[in-house]
Amino acid sequence: MDVIEFQILYTLQELRTPLVDGLMVFITSLGDHGWFWILMGVLLFSFPRTRILGGCMLTSIAAGFLLGNVMLKNIAARQRPCWLDPSVELLVPVPKDFSFPSGHSLVSFEGAVCIFLFNRKWGIPALMLAVLTAFSRLYLFVHFPTDVLAGIVMGTVIAWSVVRTAKRQMEKTDRMSGKP
């Protein structure tokens, strides 16, 4: 599997241009430590109208951090492509944590899927940003495709589960209070 994954990564390296390099570095920086999505969650949580969405985002991000970055990364202990082939010039600092799953992809899809499940109009651009973030991790040679795929799947499942639970709880609360 690593051979195919390296072939994909090397093909992306052949497509590099200065303009796309700069764009990918910027896009990936939005996922650094999840700060963009955490700030978005805090902002949404601070308004009554979007409080539940913000809470779902922050809950998803916390769960994903614990499951993906703290537990699974250390259990899988997968080396990064840039560790295995240091001859490829990186545009970002060499990451120090393990590769599987991609934390950037995980947090981006948690945030974007939460937004999409509450508001499709804003969810589509959020999902586009999440896809670009996931792609940037491949372009920048810091993750294997399966790392990114795992982050996407985990982020989607976690966000969907949190939102589904929150919406069920809201329906239950509405029924108990007599709201239609």
Enumerate the language-model features and the residues they cover.
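Interfacial segments of alpha-helical transmembrane regions
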Residues: 40-68
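Small-polar-interrupted transmembrane alpha-helices in polytopic inner-membrane proteins
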Residues: 58-74, 124-137
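N-terminal transmembrane-helix/juxtamembrane module of multi-pass inner/ER membrane proteins
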Residues: 1-36, 69-97, 173, 177-180
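Membrane-helix interfacial "entry" motifs
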Residues: 14-25, 45, 49, 53, ...
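Membrane-helix interface segments
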Residues: 19-20, 34, 49-54, 118-125
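Membrane-embedded catalytic cores of phosphoryl/pyrophosphoryl-handling enzymes
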Residues: 40, 46, 89-180
